[in-house]
Amino acid sequence: MSGVYALMDTLLPFEWLHYTFMKNALIAIVLLTPLFGMLGTMAVDNKMAFFSDALGHSALTGIAIGVVLGWQSQMSAMLLFGLIWAVLITFVKHHSKMSADTIISVFSSTSIALGLVVLSRGGAFAKYSSVLVGDVLSVAQGDLLALLLALVGTIACWVFLFNPLLITSVNAPLAQSRGVRSRMTEYAFTMLVAVAVMVSILWVGVMLINSLLILPAAASRNVARSAAGYMRTSVIIALCCGVIGLALSYYLNTSAGAAIVLCCAAVYFVTLPMRRK
């Protein structure tokens, strides 16, 4: 990593990047934000705006289960439970007459309550409360490899999922008539979102994860004129807001995650008048 740090010092001679923890945070943001930029487009198109919120809340339950089972890795517990929760939400949505937002709300409330009950036993919740707000400045060198693998894996899966997801979101009956397995595609997409959410939740936080997924895509939808442009613009907005928000958090001495989300929100409101009627 010393070579990467030296290159950053040469190419980005900014005061806020003099510190190693800020360099790690910047690398993490460059790896994380494209994930949310890509996945957010389909989440918005398929009216799954609160799906990541439910998965974020389930992170608490994942940690709780890991504590009960004596697991050392919080990430493993969160990933396992997040994937199970994503599959369950999708399964119930397809086998229930209730609306999707109602089902997601039920799962979201259940997961956060269950996690709080388990983690608060004996007053131990304070030990894990940092997951609520996250801290991208706490990213260590060892975490960057996991983020890189998540990005590469997501892009690889996205190559195969993008067209089926796109046609399904536009016209599900047409997709099925063309041999697209819409339900399996949706399961794969929700599991992909679960991985992205769980990998980043410790640094983004439960309270902000949904905003980071939805706001760049929503802003992009205001200005994009094609499916490819929609995704590309969403990734660019997420990446730029991530870097700008991190820099602002340094100079304003505030939360990096919140600053990033506010930048995304500002872009959304600026682009809102550009949206076609």
Segments predicted by a language model, with ranges:
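Membrane-helix/interface signature in polytopic inner-membrane proteins
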Residues: 156-189
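Membrane-interface helix termini and inter-helical loops of multi-pass transporters
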Residues: 8-18, 125-139, 247-248
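Membrane-interfacial amphipathic/re-entrant helices at transmembrane-helix boundaries
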Residues: 1-33
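Mid-bilayer segments of alpha-helical transmembrane spans in multi-pass integral membrane proteins
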Residues: 87, 91, 109-124, 139-147, ...
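Structural signature of hydrophobic alpha-helical transmembrane segments
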Residues: 21-33, 72-84, 148-152, 198-212, ...
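Short loop segments and helix-boundary regions at transmembrane helix junctions
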Residues: 41-125, 220-232, 249-253, 275-276
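Transmembrane alpha-helical segments in multi-pass inner-membrane proteins
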Residues: 203, 209-258
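Small-residue-rich segments of transmembrane alpha-helices in multi-pass membrane proteins
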Residues: 58-68, 106-118, 138-139, 182-194, ...
